[in-house]
UniProtKB/Swiss-Prot annotation:
Its EC number is 2.8.1.9. The gene is hxB. It is an enzyme of class 2 (transferase). It comes from the Eukaryota. Residues 663-831 form the MOSC domain. This is Molybdenum cofactor sulfurase.
Length: 842
């Protein structure tokens, strides 16, 4: 019966989803409803009609428009209370920005009481709840057992936060973990109130219902059994508006009496000349706490949101049943995935949803936290998972999910481990998410009212396609450790092409045939010396987020001594045909250094002291071209000093180690964030400019050809050849004699086993394989994004959970054959040229 009802619900959503939620494209999957759910088009249309058809004024005035606003706001306040089963006779609702703002309002009010307050919080609390401990006189994080003891009447935890008697004790907990979806009894507030009714210090309760109410009905009922404070965010239920609520039991109103601050609209009278005196409003609690003008339009939109949501999806209990059914399906399907050797693909941290013992609701919400393992038992990097998910337009959350207790318990992370990881540079959202082979975050799939069985099926199919080893072709390749057969120094390759990318992540400039190009320790001359910085954040822009950057074409004009830049996209009104800047380090074209230091730039996670151009017309050219407010900045050679210095991140990978190299590889001490590194080559770290990882990136045409053959074998006639430009390499090598049988250098991917190269008369050291992301899928001619070649690379070139193609290398004056000539005090660096012969050192 339940399945039939859900089938009806699912069919109804399928019928109207394309019309109501056009932002979910046919190939998209949205699985981040715990972050925010999606807003139906009819809600936006209803809100627009309301705004266009009615005149709403500031509620603090007495005009007709103001009175209309006041009347509507109070009606919607009542609707919101009724939505959560809260009688206006026993509760008041305070509009706030979001759940976090409600939590902060409570904590600041309790802090102002004589003696402050003690704080007890459950281990599954969101970071916004944990942060309250900084406002408290003392605080304790409660485990499951300690919480049960407190509810049973134990004063052990209570005594620890009341040694210096506080004005109150606050117990905070979540109705549903935003980490793994576990639900906690809504009866805790009543239980703790009854168990400690005779105590000297009153215990008040704060319920974080933000995650819970997104897909489940909340009925606060009688105030004597309800939490003193309940916080939530409406956008998690309706997608729009961006608004939150703090619902307060009237018996707890007195806890706000010590609050100091007052804003406009919350007082009846203020004296500030000769005397300081004010009279707070003494009616409803919300009149004293809603400082300043309310977010009028957000509140008005809430009225439409409640009506539209109920019209589309019915009562919340129906939404809850549907979302729970989908969660059961996803958990079952993920649990049943196995590699060909029998090992499980997924490690799940969320339990299978079951009805509560009392028959009221479920013990688990529609949130599934998990990680993925390879067939050999190693963890799949969250960064690699996100790259593939982004490629398939799967919108999902990864990381520690703003839940420190949940992540620590699920991954068995001790405090010392988390501190060590932080010291090693690991951050939530950073690309490096493994510490000594152990994950530091999880994947979270969360479902909502407009999710369907198709979303679940297609997501599971995605996991199978990219992460399930069926035995036919291993998803995580283990390259044999073999000794290359050809002797070192045999010539068979030459330089096919040379390309530099003067502006990071923009189009490349091909070095003409016959042109000798200078090579420096930081890389090829003029390569990635400039970048575009976001005006607001100072973050360097990249094609990964802004693919139109591929259409910005720089040209190095050595005769005029300038870098000329044009735009190859569709014509943009009033956009100059081209702009240019001097190649010389002319200080007059940059903003003063004091201006730069106030807003440091960030490139690939590094803080960099770039020099920003002050020409407004120049910066406007780039802003218009890619549609993002940005400025042009430069990080020329010689800028690397102190904290601004950038070093190569490239290193030898496990799959590159041949038999005779094993003794050259050593383990790195714990805390470094890596597991192995190379010790051969230059013993000094290589300085780099604005490249991601190394001074020079090299690819082999034999490898590009092999990859294209693989794509063709998988996609047949629909396959489109991937050009070398997709990989944005500086140096492309090719065979000099195509008629010869394949030798070691002619084999695809043989470059990953080379120790070094001699090009012309200069020696280069190989630093390690190049880790790839979905940016290789951006067409460098059109700026459009596809799914190849990363889709095929992830299935054929994945090692240790990471995808590689091409190799990093560096030239350095430390090699015996590399002579740097000093002439008249200037350094004369060597050159490289298209067509030069290449000797391989294996």
């Amino acid at each position: 019966m339940a399945q039939n009802l859900d089938a009806q619900y699912n069919a109804a959503v399928e019928r109207f989803r394309s019309e109501e939620f056009p932002m979910i494209r046919v190939d998209s999957i949205y699985l981040d409803h715990a972050g925010t759910t999606l807003c139906p088009k009819s809600l936006l249309e209803a809100f627009a009609r309301d705004m266009a058809g009615n005149l709403y004024g500031n509620p603090h005035s007495a005009s007709n428009s103001s009175q209309l606003s006041t009347s509507r706001i109070e009606d919607i306040r009542l609707q919101a209370l009724q939505l959560f089963g809260a009688s206006p006779d026993e509760f008041d609702l305070v509009f706030v920005a979001n759940a976090t703002a409600g939590i902060k309002l409570v904590s600041e009010s309790l802090r102002a009481r004589d003696g402050g307050f003690g704080f007890l919080y459950h281990q599954a609390s969101h970071t916004s709840l944990v942060g309250v401990r900084e406002e408290a006189q003392s605080s304790i994080c409660l485990s499951e057992d300690e919480t049960e003891e407190l509810l049973a009447g134990s004063t052990t935890s209570l005594d620890l936060v009341t040694r210096s008697p506080p004005g109150a004790v606050l117990l905070a907990y979540t109705a549903q973990s935003n980490f793994d979806g576990r639900r906690y009894p809504l009866t805790w507030a009543d239980k703790v109130r009854r168990a400690h009714a005779s105590g000297c210090t009153p215990i008040c309760t704060l319920l974080d219902a933000a995650s819970f109410v997104s897909t489940s009905p909340l009925h606060l009922g009688e105030s004597k059994a309800a939490p003193d404070f309940t916080v939530l965010s409406f956008y998690k239920i309706f997608g729009f508006p961006d608004l939150g609520a703090l619902i307060v039991r009237k018996q707890a109103w007195h806890l706000f009496e010590s609050r100091k601050y007052f804003g406009g609209g919350t007082v009846d009278m203020v004296v500030n000349f000769k005397e300081s005196w004010h009279a707070p409003k003494n009616g409803f609690l919300h009149e004293r706490l809603e400082d300043g003008t309310l977010p009028i339009h957000n509140i008005l939109a809430l009225g439409s949101a409640i009506k539209i949501h109920q019209g589309l999806f019915g009562p919340m209990r129906t939404v809850s049943s549907h979302a729970t059914f989908l969660a059961q399906e996803m958990i079952t399907n993920l649990q049943n995935l196995h590699h060909s050797n029998g090992e499980k693909v997924c490690t799940l941290y969320s339990p299978y949803p079951k009805p509560n013992v009392d028959g009221n609701g479920w013990n688990q919400g529609p949130i599934i936290a998990f990680n993925i393992c390879t067939s050999n038992g190693s963890w799949v990097s969250l960064g690699e998972f996100e790259k593939l998910a982004s490629l398939r337009d799967i919108n999902i959350r990864t990381g520690s999910l703003c839940n420190p207790g949940g992540i620590a318990i699920a991954l068995a992370l001790e405090p010392w481990e988390m501190k060590r990881n932080f010291s090693a540079g690991l951050r939530c959202g950073a690309d490096n998410d493994m510490a000594l082979g152990k994950p530091t975050g999880v994947i979270r799939a969360s479902l909502g009212a407009m999710s369907t069985t198709s979303d679940v099926d297609r997501f599971v199919a995605f996991i199978v396609e990219f992460f399930c080893d069926d035995g036919a072709a291993s998803r995580d390749l283990q390259t044999p450790r073999v000794q290359p057969s050809l002797a070192s120094g045999e010539a068979e390759l030459c330089v096919d092409s040379l390309t530099i990318y003067p502006i990071k992540s923009c189009a490349g400039y091909s070095i003409p045939h016959g042109k000798q190009w200078q090579v420096r320790p930081e890389g090829l001359a003029w390569d990635r010396e400039w970048c575009l910085l976001h005006r607001g954040s100072g973050q360097a822009l990249s094609q990964k987020r802004y693919p139109k950057m591929a259409l910005i074409k720089p040209v190095v004009d050595l005769e005029s001594g300038r870098l000329a830049v044009g735009y190859l996209g569709e014509p943009i009104p009033y956009l100059p045909e081209r702009v240019s800047v001097p190649l010389s380090h002319d200080p007059s074209v940059f903003r003063p250094s004091t201006y730069v230091s106030a807003a440091p730039s960030r490139v690939c996670g590094d803080q960099v002291a770039t020099k920003i151009y002050h020409d407004d017309e120049l910066n406007e050219f780039f802003s218009k071209a890619i549609g993002v407010p940005c400025v042009l900045a430069r990080f020329p050679p010689g800028s690397q000093h102190g904290d601004a210095q950038r070093s190569s991140k490239a290193r030898l990978q496990k799959h590159q180690i041949t038999t005779d190299q094993e003794s050259d590889v050593q383990e790195v001490h714990p805390g470094s964030g890596t597991t192995t590194d190379s010790t051969w080559g230059n013993d000094k770290s290589q300085n780099i400019l604005l490249s991601n990882e190394s001074p020079i990136l090299l690819i082999n045409l034999a490898s590009v050809d092999a990859l294209n053959q693989e794509i063709k074998s998988r996609k047949g006639s629909s396959a489109v050849r991937i050009p070398t430009s997709a990989f944005r390499a500086n140096v492309v090598l090719r065979r000099t004699d195509e008629s010869r049988p394949d030798g070691a250098q002619g084999l695809p991917y043989a470059e990953e086993r080379w120790r070094g190269l001699t090009i012309g008369n200069q020696t280069y050291t190989m630093l390690g394989a190049c880790r790839r992301c979905q940016m290789v899928c951006v067409d460098q001619v059109t700026g459009c994004r596809g799914d190849e070649p990363f889709s095929t690379l992830s299935k054929t070139r994945r090692f240790d959970g990471k995808v590689f193609f091409g190799v990093h290398m560096a030239w350095g004056p430390g090699s015996p054959s590399n002579n740097v000539v000093a002439a008249r005090g200037d350094v004369a660096y060597p050159t490289i040229e298209v067509g030069e012969r290449v000797l391989v050192h294996v």
